[in-house]
């Protein structure tokens, strides 16, 4: 399933009844968030606000408001098919040579997909149909949403920030929120470990005092947007991965004012620079934790050019206590993570990041346990294998007879198979999400691993309990006569 641009995807969603056009005048200040939040919690459609109060530019919200829409954006029909995306990423992360002639042909589809990885550079692009520069640059023309009553200012949320380190061949795409503080200025809130911040740090070391080029694309095609939030290998660019998802090369164009390349079909592109040493206090903002975060200084992004499509659409979202759009993305991307982890740890049966745990702060892993201490190895592996789990505070490891996605099962395993002193692992002074105000130091805190597996010799000296199992023959006999018994008329035979 191929979408050339965001508008193709909008058209498909509308055909499927997955997009609602809102013709009434709605204020980007708080009102859009209220409508989007109610719609998302009800599993409703994407929303296109055609008449934002005080603006002529429509606003697109809740684009990825259900896991199935995330899957559609990745070119798949349902969430389960995202396991195939994960298998492709696992293959790209650690490709293996064919083990024989048959294996060569089995892997041929994966190798053919690699042909779509290089970008296609255009000279003329839709995203540059209109160009604003100098005094004409005015961010207040864009209907940037203010999401929560205590937010400091309107906030750009879905911008794909494009950077390149001075010694890197490939660009980095990252999504960092940006507070509007003037007609041509935003605050770039990127954390120190993120790709954009690392590129900036390297730039400042090699080009002290020089301006760092930055571009931000808004309203790219869904494959490019989702490529920026997917755990692609460090050696693979987000544009290359988007080409794999789309099945066609990602079309890019050189920016008007710098050498960065942006998605050619993007609705809006902000071009400019960060002046080393220029910072401003960012926040507070309501975020995905359900709280307002503290104020801190971040670099100022000065916009020198705005390029856009004719009749541009502004793509936006809000973040708050789950469920929100990032939590929905987390549910879908969970399926991508599983094959990647299984490639490194074949003993993993399932891996689950509950959305109520902010989609990354708590993980439940089920394994085919093979030896004493196995659960602890898996805990350490989860924390260290992918940088996406650097901020996962709690890892619960269970046996494969437990459903990782059923809290009844998980709580049963914790309360019957764990001794708190023996089976709890605490690791101090580890990287923690900057937004986690529960940590004693900003960005540094502890992690907890919980071994809720059955204990093997060497882990306990006691006789271990045997789970109760029903007799299958008895269950089958009662199933056959259950309806005749008429005990619970609405309850079918199991």
Swiss-Prot record:
The keyword Manganese applies. Disulfide bonds: none annotated. The active site is at 287 (proton donor). Prenylated FMN binds at residues 175-177, 189-191, 194-195. One of its GO terms (biological process) is ubiquinone biosynthetic process. The keyword Lipid metabolism does not apply. It is a peripheral membrane protein. Keywords: Cell membrane, Decarboxylase, Flavoprotein, FMN, Lyase, Manganese, Membrane, Metal-binding, Ubiquinone biosynthesis. Pathway: Cofactor biosynthesis; ubiquinone biosynthesis. One of its GO terms (cellular component) is cytosol. Its main location: membrane. It is found in: Cell membrane. Gene3D superfamilies: Single helix bin, UbiD C-terminal domain-like. Mn(2+) binds at residues 172, 238. Its cofactor is prenylated FMN; Mn(2+). One of its GO terms (molecular function) is metal ion binding. It is an enzyme of class 4 (lyase). Binds 1 prenylated FMN per subunit. It catalyses: a 4-hydroxy-3-(all-trans-polyprenyl)benzoate + H(+) = a 2-(all-trans-polyprenyl)phenol + CO2. Its EC number is 4.1.1.98. SUPFAM superfamilies: FMN-binding split barrel (SSF50475), UbiD C-terminal domain-like (SSF143968). PANTHER family: 3-OCTAPRENYL-4-HYDROXYBENZOATE CARBOXY-LYASE-RELATED (PTHR30108), FERULIC ACID DECARBOXYLASE 1 (PTHR30108:SF17). Belongs to the UbiD family. Catalyzes the decarboxylation of 3-octaprenyl-4-hydroxy benzoate to 2-octaprenylphenol, an intermediate step in ubiquinone biosynthesis. Homohexamer. This is 3-octaprenyl-4-hydroxybenzoate carboxy-lyase. It comes from Erwinia tasmaniensis (strain DSM 17950 / CFBP 7177 / CIP 109463 / NCPPB 4357 / Et1/99). The lineage of its organism: Bacteria, Pseudomonadati, Pseudomonadota, Gammaproteobacteria, Enterobacterales.
């Amino acid at each position: 399933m191929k979408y050339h641009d965001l508008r193709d995807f909008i058209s498909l969603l509308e055909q499927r009844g997955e997009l609602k056009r809102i013709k009434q005048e709605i204020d980007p200040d708080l009102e859009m968030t209220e409508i989007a939040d109610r719609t998302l919690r009800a599993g409703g459609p994407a929303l296109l606000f055609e008449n934002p109060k005080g603006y002529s530019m429509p606003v697109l919200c809740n684009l990825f408001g259900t896991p199935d829409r995330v899957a559609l954006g990745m070119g798949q029909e349902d969430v389960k098919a995202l396991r195939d995306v994960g298998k492709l990423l696992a293959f790209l992360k650690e490709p293996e040579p064919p083990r024989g002639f048959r294996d060569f042909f089995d892997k041929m589809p994966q190798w053919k997909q690699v042909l779509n990885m290089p970008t296609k550079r255009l000279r003329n692009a839709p995203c540059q149909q209109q160009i604003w520069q100098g005094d004409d640059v005015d961010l207040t023309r864009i209907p940037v949403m203010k999401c929560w009553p205590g937010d400091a200012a309107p906030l750009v949320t879905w911008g794909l920030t494009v950077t390149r380190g001075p010694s890197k061949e490939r660009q980095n795409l990252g999504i960092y929120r940006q507070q509007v503080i003037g007609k041509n200025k935003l605050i770039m809130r990127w954390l120190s470990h993120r790709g954009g911040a690392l590129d900036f740090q390297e730039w400042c070391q090699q080009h002290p005092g020089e301006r760092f080029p930055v571009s931000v694309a808004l309203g790219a095609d869904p494959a490019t947007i989702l490529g920026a939030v997917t755990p692609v290998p460090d050696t693979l660019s987000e544009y290359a991965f988007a080409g794999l998802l789309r099945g066609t090369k990602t079309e890019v164009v050189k920016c008007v004012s710098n050498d960065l390349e942006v998605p050619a079909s993007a609705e809006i592109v902000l071009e400019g620079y960060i002046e080393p040493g220029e910072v401003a206090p960012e926040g507070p903002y309501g975020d995905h934790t359900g709280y307002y975060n503290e104020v801190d200084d971040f670099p100022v992004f000065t916009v020198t050019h705005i390029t856009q499509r004719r009749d541009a659409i502004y793509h936006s979202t809000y973040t708050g206590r789950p469920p929100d759009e990032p939590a929905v993305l987390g549910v879908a991307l969970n399926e991508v993570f599983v094959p990647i982890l299984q490639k490194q740890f074949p003993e993993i049966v399932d891996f689950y990041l509950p959305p109520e745990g902010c989609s990354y702060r708590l993980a439940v892993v089920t394994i085919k346990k093979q030896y004493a201490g196995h659960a602890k190895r898996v805990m350490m592996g989860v924390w260290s294998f992918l940088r996406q789990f650097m901020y996962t505070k709690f890892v619960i490891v269970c046996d494969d007879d437990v459903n990782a996605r059923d809290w009844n099962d998980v709580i049963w395993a914790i309360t019957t198979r764990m001794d708190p002193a023996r089976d709890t692992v605490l690791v101090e002074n580890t990287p923690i999400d900057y937004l986690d105000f529960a940590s004693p130091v900003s960005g540094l805190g502890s992690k907890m691993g919980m071994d809720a597996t059955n204990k093997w010799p060497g882990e306990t000296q006691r006789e271990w309990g045997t789970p109760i199992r029903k007799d299958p023959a008895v269950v089958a006999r009662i199933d056959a006569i259950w309806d005749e018994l008429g005990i619970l008329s609405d309850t079918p035979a199991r």
